[in-house]
């Protein structure tokens, strides 16, 4: 019996592999526990009878078998399952046929084995148990071999389909399938039973029954009991999901256990497959893959979560650069490292904090998440890359050679070395390795980026215009806002070719002089350094300052490095919390002292220009600030403040608040004499000019009173700004250590004028005694410069465009010569400049001599704006809108009579034409002589069409042609005609609204004939008006058209009308004719033109000397009166020159008879 069972089961396993064999064994034991013994015996008899007689299946049986197999393929098609394809036991996947690896098999076999044990205890003997166990063990081995040896690949799927038919025929010969089907269909005959155990028969019969019923719905019942058992088994079993098994087997590298009712994508993880076998079918379309396990995720978040959970990410901070390519090889995806631009990719995919490069965005993201470096990335972006693009070519050399003031490399590492020793030894190329061709962005390999950023921070956060460095991006932003340098950089980039070529020393100075930081505090070093030098005579200070200037000239490349004196370094180290440049706190604090810089500048510019340009303010807001600064700063030397900051490193290096520590009242420091009085004098001179132009010439007495008032106000206010003193009027030694706190002016200082020649002599005789004195004089320069921007009250801001104009003039004049004649009045010189600007861009020494004391910052301050210190700087008349700051120590008596007498000598024609001369002068200066670009004039021209004072033919333009807007070049009469015609085309709807209708072709032709405008131009104008009305509901001459209450505006007199008819009548009053007469007028106008053009052509053809053999007629263009010998030529002319369409050619062509040669 054991051999019979073994033979039967060996034959049966083929069918089990084809069909759902993983359900076969568990269910056969389930059935063995419940099928009656009689039924089992009958099944066994049928089986043996079929085997002995070799009966073949009848037609019905064969048909049923085929149907059964076909149905099995249709339902589940187990043969197509890649379950056993390349089943690699080593992959860790337990076959569903093994009794231990599959959860479903284990689950189903549990109950069957329990039932089987009960039956065996009751019915079976020990021999039967042993035989059954042996047979089961043998069958397990057979199935294991079958599964491991079979090739269920995609190539053999079709073969396995046909194998089903062949297997059925083979089995029919051996009667295995016969027995199975006969039992299932109750065709077995009663044959004597062999002595097999009931349990074995039960096993055999139930196995066949389960197999048949699981694969076919046509299975018939053996008996009622057996049928119930089969149905129960079917309802309790779970159908095998071949697709899941295939995915799980082919995609998985780790052990996987099939769940009872798995969902396809909930349990299948999309791991990287063997693409050679299956291609991209199961690869998934995800973009983000784990490098370690190749798991794909739709989102970067999913990948990040996976990496964090599994630990598959790598700490790239610890990897070496050379090992990365080897470890992270990806067969299916070419990484950025393997492509041509891997270096560029590494530059882009780089951690901004530690400097590591990554080959993919996922790697960088994981690195950032793991290391939290995204929280530490500095928000300061490297600027020199932009600088190299935007900075003009003349500036690039200086920009690269000069180090930033705060750069770590620019500060001497040995604090004991004074400035004079350290500055010359610094090699600019070595000190600024940041700006190199191969290191554009300043990123270095490795994790040293943070250190390098700190080391190069001063160069990164550097103003591209003036070169000043800043500690934070906010400081740089504030600096750019206040000084307007960002506007200059932008404009200079577009106008690179307009730089003026100066001599090298001047050019270097221009490029290296930045505007000072606008702060309300004086540098303490100026005051602290005073006690160090026991003797401070005023002339000695002058000499030291002048000597300091010369001392710094050979070191222009070090100007921006701002080497600190040891004493300054100590103070800087003591006050690390203080910053060198304007901070947000400074902007907040500045209004306390009445120094709201932005507001004061805005008020200044708008007020001053409103007076200069016929009382209409045209600049406002930030443009006014930038315009004012650019008028002064387009040549940086024009502002006395410019150089002091960079030449004077101690001012920047020391804390801004240090001044307040020494002088609690924040008053003018006596150690900072000089430039502002010059600037104040400029302001006074320009004020005087404006008053002369307007016919108001206050008396000398009035001016003195105003000056005295201003002095007292300014001093009593105790503004936190430097002392505005003239260099020539230095305080005496007694005054150097005590700030003046009252509104009186020291008479000794007032009456101590020093000439430029004396300066030079003393400059030659007196060297700088020590670094402290030099620094003190530098600080004095810086303080005086600060006054230009900051030392003013909110009511009277200091910087005005007129003084800026004067600064520009004097700057260029200062470049012309270095001799000075201080007795010439700057006002008279201003008129000479304006009158002679067109003929003489450069001036003779007599004119230029007066500028020498002004221009102090180039060669001995030769480029200081116009110096009025030789004249009394306090006597000029003042405007309410221009601010002048009078220092307590800056007044000299030498120029009071000069200004007063010259004010009376100015002739009335000069007064009348002064503004026009100034505008011409500014245009020429800014367009031809400005080293940066013509930004001052361009700003003034572009800011408003009303600023036509900068245009050449201003006096020829009518007021309408000066108006704003894109149509400012239109003939006002043409515009009135167009507007009237458009208004006439409006149609009123019953609800009171107006509908825009197009002008008819006849109306357009009339306009075209009368105005000479092309049809295209008229169409464009109409289309533009319609677009504006649709988009905004209004245009320049028509408002609120959508509301039903339109407002018509006359562009000629600004009158307002509510209805189109009244508006048209008004426009017709301006035109002098009605629109109905337009067609008649156009014809009459053409006739008049013909009469006029005949006379013109007579002269023209006499000049042309036409040959007699020419054609009998010539053709004239009515629009421009040019003549042509052929109709074709004139039509070509009309099309190309005037844009006329061919259909209108005849309208604009006049045929003239040939003129006889004169």
Curated annotation (Swiss-Prot):
Subcellular location: Nucleus
A GO term from the CC aspect: nucleus
ZnF (C2H2-type) residues: 288-312, 349-373, 461-485, 1048-1070, 1115-1138
InterPro entries: HD (IPR001356), Teashirt_fam (IPR027008), Znf_C2H2_type (IPR013087)
Alphabetized SMART domains for the sequence: HOX, ZnF_C2H2
Polar residues bias: start-end ranges: 76-88
DNA-binding region: 963-1033
Predominant place of localization: nucleus
Swiss-Prot/TrEMBL induction comment: Up-regulated in embryos by all-trans retinoic acid at the prim-5 stage (24 hpf) in more anterior regions of the neural tube, especially in the midbrain, with weaker expression in the forebrain and in the eye primordium.
A single MF term (Gene Ontology): DNA-binding transcription factor activity, RNA polymerase II-specific
The family this protein is said to belong to: Belongs to the teashirt C2H2-type zinc-finger protein family.
Function in brief: Probable transcriptional regulator involved in developmental processes. May act as a transcriptional repressor (Potential).
Protein name in UniProt: Teashirt homolog 1
């Amino acid at each position: 019996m054991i051999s019979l069972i073994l033979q039967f089961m060996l034959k049966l396993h083929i069918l089990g592999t084809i069909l759902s064999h993983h359900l076969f064994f568990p269910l056969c034991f389930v059935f063995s526990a419940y099928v009656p013994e009689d039924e089992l015996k009958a099944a066994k008899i049928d089986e043996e009878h079929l085997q002995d007689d070799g009966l073949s299946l009848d037609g019905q049986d064969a048909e049923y078998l085929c149907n059964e197999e076909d149905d099995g393929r249709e339902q589940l098609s187990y043969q197509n399952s890649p379950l056993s394809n390349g089943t690699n036991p080593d992959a860790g996947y337990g076959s569903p046929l093994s009794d231990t690896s599959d959860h479903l098999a284990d689950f189903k076999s549990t109950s069957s084995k329990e039932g089987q044990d009960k039956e065996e205890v009751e019915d079976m003997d020990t021999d039967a148990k042993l035989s059954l166990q042996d047979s089961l063990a043998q069958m397990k081995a057979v199935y294991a071999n079958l599964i491991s040896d079979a090739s269920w690949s995609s190539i053999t799927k079709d073969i396995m389909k046909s194998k089903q038919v062949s297997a059925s025929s083979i089995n029919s010969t051996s009667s295995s399938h016969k027995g199975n089907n006969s039992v299932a269909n109750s065709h077995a005959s009663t044959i004597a039973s062999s002595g097999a155990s009931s349990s074995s028969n039960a096993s055999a019969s139930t196995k066949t029954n389960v197999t048949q019923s699981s694969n076919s719905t046509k299975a018939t019942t053996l008996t009622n009991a057996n049928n119930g058992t089969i149905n129960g088994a079917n309802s309790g079993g779970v159908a095998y999901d071949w697709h899941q098994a295939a995915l799980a087997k082919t995609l998985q590298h780790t052990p996987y256990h099939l769940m009872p009712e798995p969902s396809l994508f909930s349990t299948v993880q999309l791991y990287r497959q063997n693409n050679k076998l299956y291609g991209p079918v199961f690869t998934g379309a995800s973009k983000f893959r784990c490098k370690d396990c190749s798991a794909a995720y739709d989102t970067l978040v999913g990948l990040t979560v996976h990496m964090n959970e599994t630990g598959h990410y790598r700490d790239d901070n610890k990897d070496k650069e050379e090992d990365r390519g080897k470890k992270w090889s990806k067969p299916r995806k070419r990484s950025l490292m393997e492509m041509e631009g891997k270096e560029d990719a590494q530059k882009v995919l780089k951690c901004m904090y530690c400097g590591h490069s990554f080959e993919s965005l996922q790697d960088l993201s994981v690195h950032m998440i793991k290391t939290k470096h995204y929280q530490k990335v500095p928000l300061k972006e490297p600027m020199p890359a932009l600088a190299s693009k935007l900075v003009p070519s003349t500036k690039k050399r200086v920009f690269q050679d000069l180090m930033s003031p705060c750069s770590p490399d620019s500060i001497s590492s040995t604090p004991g070395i004074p400035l004079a020793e350290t500055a010359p030894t610094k090699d600019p190329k070595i000190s600024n390795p940041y700006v190199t061709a191969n290191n554009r962005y300043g990123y270095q390999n490795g994790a040293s980026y943070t250190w390098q950023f700190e080391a190069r921070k001063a160069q990164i956060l550097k103003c591209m215009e003036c070169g000043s460095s800043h500690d934070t991006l906010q400081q740089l932003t504030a600096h750019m806002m206040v000084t307007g340098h960002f506007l200059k950089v932008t404009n200079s980039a577009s106008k690179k070719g307009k730089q003026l070529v100066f001599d090298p020393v001047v050019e270097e100075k221009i490029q290296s002089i930045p505007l000072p930081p606008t702060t309300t505090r004086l540098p303490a070093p100026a005051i602290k350094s005073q006690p160090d030098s026991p003797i401070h005579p005023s002339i000695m200070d002058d000499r030291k300052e002048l000597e300091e200037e010369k001392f710094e000239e050979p070191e222009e490349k070090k100007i921006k490095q701002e080497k600190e004196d040891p004493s300054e370094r100590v103070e800087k180290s003591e006050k690390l919390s203080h910053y060198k440049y304007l901070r947000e706190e400074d902007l907040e604090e500045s209004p306390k002292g009445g120094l709201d810089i932005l507001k004061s500048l805005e008020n200044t510019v708008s007020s001053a220009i409103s007076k200069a340009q016929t009382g209409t303010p045209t600049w406002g807001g930030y443009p006014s600030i930038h315009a004012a600064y650019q008028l002064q700063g387009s040549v940086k030397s024009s502002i006395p403040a410019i150089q002091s900051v960079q030449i004077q490193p101690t001012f920047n290096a020391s804390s801004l608040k240090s001044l307040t520590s020494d002088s609690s009242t924040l008053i003018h420091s006596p150690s900072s004499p000089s430039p502002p009085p010059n600037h104040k004098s400029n302001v006074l001179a320009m004020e005087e000019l404006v008053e002369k132009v307007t016919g108001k010439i206050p008396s000398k007495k009035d001016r003195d009173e105003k000056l005295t008032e201003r002095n007292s106000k300014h001093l009593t206010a105790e503004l936190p700004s430097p002392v505005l003193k003239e260099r020539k009027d230095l305080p005496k030694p007694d005054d150097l250590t005590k700030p003046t706190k009252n509104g009186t002016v020291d008479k000794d200082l007032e009456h101590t004028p020093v000439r430029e020649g004396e300066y030079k002599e003393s400059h030659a005789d007196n060297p700088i005694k020590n670094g402290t004195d030099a620094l003190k004089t530098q600080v004095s320069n810086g303080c005086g410069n600060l006054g230009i921007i900051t030392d003013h009250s909110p009511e009277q801001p200091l910087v005005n465009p007129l003084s800026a104009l004067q600064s520009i003039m004097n700057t260029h004049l200062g470049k012309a010569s270095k001799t000075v004649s201080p007795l010439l009045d700057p006002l008279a010189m201003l008129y000479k400049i304006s009158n002679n600007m067109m003929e003489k861009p450069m001036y003779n020494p007599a004119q230029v001599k007066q500028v020498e004391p002004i221009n102090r910052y180039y060669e001995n301050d030769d480029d200081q704006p116009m110096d009025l210190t030789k004249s009394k700087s306090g006597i000029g008349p003042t405007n309410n809108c221009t601010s002048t700051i009078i220092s307590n120590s800056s007044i000299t008596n030498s120029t009071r009579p000069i200004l007063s007498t010259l004010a009376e000598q100015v002739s009335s024609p000069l007064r009348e034409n002064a503004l026009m001369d100034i505008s011409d002068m500014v245009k020429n200066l800014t367009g031809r002589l400005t080293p940066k670009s013509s930004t001052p004039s361009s700003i003034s021209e572009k800011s408003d069409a009303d600023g036509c004072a900068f245009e050449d033919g201003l006096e020829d333009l009518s007021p309408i042609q000066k108006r704003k807007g894109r149509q400012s070049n239109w003939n006002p009469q043409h515009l009135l005609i167009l507007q009237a015609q458009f208004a006439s085309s409006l149609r009123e709807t019953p609800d009171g609204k107006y509908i825009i209708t197009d002008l008819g072709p006849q109306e357009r032709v009339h306009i075209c004939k009368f105005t000479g405008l092309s049809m295209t131009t008229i169409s464009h104008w109409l289309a533009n008006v319609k677009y504006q009305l649709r988009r905004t509901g209004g245009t320049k001459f028509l408002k609120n058209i959508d509301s039903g209450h339109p407002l018509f505006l006359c562009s000629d007199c600004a009158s307002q009308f509510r209805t189109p008819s009244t508006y048209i009548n008004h426009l017709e009053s301006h035109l002098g004719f009605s629109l109905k007469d337009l067609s008649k007028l156009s014809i009459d106008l053409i006739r008049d033109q013909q009469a006029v053009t005949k006379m013109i052509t007579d002269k023209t053809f006499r000049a042309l000397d036409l040959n007699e053999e020419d054609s009998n007629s010539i053709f004239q263009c009515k629009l421009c009166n040019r003549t042509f010998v052929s109709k074709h030529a004139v039509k070509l002319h009309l099309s190309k020159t005037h844009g006329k369409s061919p259909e209108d050619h005849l309208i604009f062509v006049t045929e003239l008879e040939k003129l006889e040669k004169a």
